[in-house]
Structure formats: C-alpha cells, structure tokens
Amino acid sequence: MDQTSSSTQILVSLMENAQPDPTAGQPVAQVILDNFCLSSMYSPDVLRNPRAQHTIKTAVFQWIDEHHRKMYDCPIEPPLRFTDDAHLSADRCWHHLIGKLERVVSVLRAMRAMSRFEHNVFVFLPYCKRLRALVELFRHDYCCQSTVAGCARALDETIADAQRHLLVVRSMSERAAVMLVFSDWVRVYQCNICEDSSAEEQFLKPNVCCGYRVCNACYAKLWEFCTGAYPVCPICKTGFKSSSSNKRLQKADDPATL
C-alpha cells in the first residue's frame, strides 16, 4: 500500500469515528467558551506580550505537526513549519512543496473534523494564512493546477470559518470588558499630571512619597525641566534624588528644590 492510500484511509477513519456533537442547540458563544482548548496557557499579559502569543501559536503548530507524523510518518518539513522564514528564494525550484502543502492541508481537514478542534478552528488561523500565502505562489504554475486550487479552496474555507468564530469571540470580549468595569480585578493606572492611563503597573513611577501618581514620561520631564539639583513631588515637595546605582528618596531640605 502506498503512502497516499494509507493516509487517505487514516483520514476516512478519523471522519467515520467522529462522535455526535453534544453541543447541538447550544448558543455558539457558550459552546466556544466551554470547549476552548488553550485555556491553560492564560497569562495576565497575554494580549500585550508577543513572546507569550508566539508560544501559544507554536503550541498549536506542534499539534498539527504531531498529527502530520501520525498520518504520514514524518514531520512537516521546512519551509512549511510555523517558525520557518516564509520567504522562498527565487533562485531555486520549489515545485516539490505542492505535494507537501497538500498533505498539510489534509491534516488540517482531518483535525477540523475532530471534536477537540471543531469549535476551536480559529486557533489554526495564523498557520492557515501562512500556508495560503505559500499556495498563492504556485497559483499560475503550468502543472498541478487542480491540486493547488484544491489546497487554496480548503484553506479559504478554514480561514473563513475561523474568522466567523473570532467574530463571536470578539463580541464576548467586548461584553466581558464592560462587565469587568464593576469588578476590582481590572486595575487602571492613571497619571495625575498628564491623565494618560494604562493597564500596566510599570506605566507609573513607583510610589515613594505621598501617593501622587506620576507616569514615567512625566517623571522624565520633571528631571528635564527641574531648576534645582533634582525634581520634587508636585504635591508634598519630596525630592527625587538619583544616584548611579539606584533611585532613592530624599526629603528636600535644600530651599532651591522647593
């Protein structure tokens, strides 16, 4: 039995063994929320931390690669891996990628049919967009047009489905943001001088005197425009003295700093 027929049988088996959907009739938002497969990777700064985001996306690719190994007995090869440079040099032939792209698309199709990923299709979106860009490079090749078109169609369907799910996720996020206004969980750090605000605690200079909140940008301006040896707190007139090793607090005894 050749590799193609073997992988086809695996795909058919996965589709036939799919369990009935126990979530039928439930609101889509609730189904997505209850079945999200990456909840354990939460961190407080996940929306503002590119490294954390990359780690999560890489974890999804590792799942895809694992299923590719099961279906084809080999890992996904460069440059089709999520962490590879997507740029293809024009001074060499890349036609061999078409067959490999088709195999990866088959893996994604099989995973979409699994109950674990049925309501998590949006986690495949970054990788699908990457594959779609690679498929487009072969769109006008003389041969293999049906294979390329089939890959493009499958990826377009997955991307469209993922984006529909993300519209629901965005709606949930917007509602949750308003709901959390009534809780003490979400803190907003606001500068008393410029009145800019941030969700990051590091946005404000550490409190070392009366609690008057000063952001780091305004703190830098206080140093820039101070007329004495060092700037003072606008409220309690406590002086901020800096040394080469650290920043420490000193009560402004010198009249020039008042």
Curated annotation (Swiss-Prot):
Keyword Transit peptide: no
Zn-finger segments (RING-type): 191-237
Keyword Zinc-finger: yes
InterPro entries tied to this protein: Baculo_IE-1, Znf_RING
Keywords: Early protein, Metal-binding, Zinc, Zinc-finger
Gene: IE-0
Coiled-coil region(s): none
Gene Ontology MF term list: zinc ion binding
Protein name: Immediate-early protein IE-0
Organism whose genome encodes this protein: Lymantria dispar multicapsid nuclear polyhedrosis virus
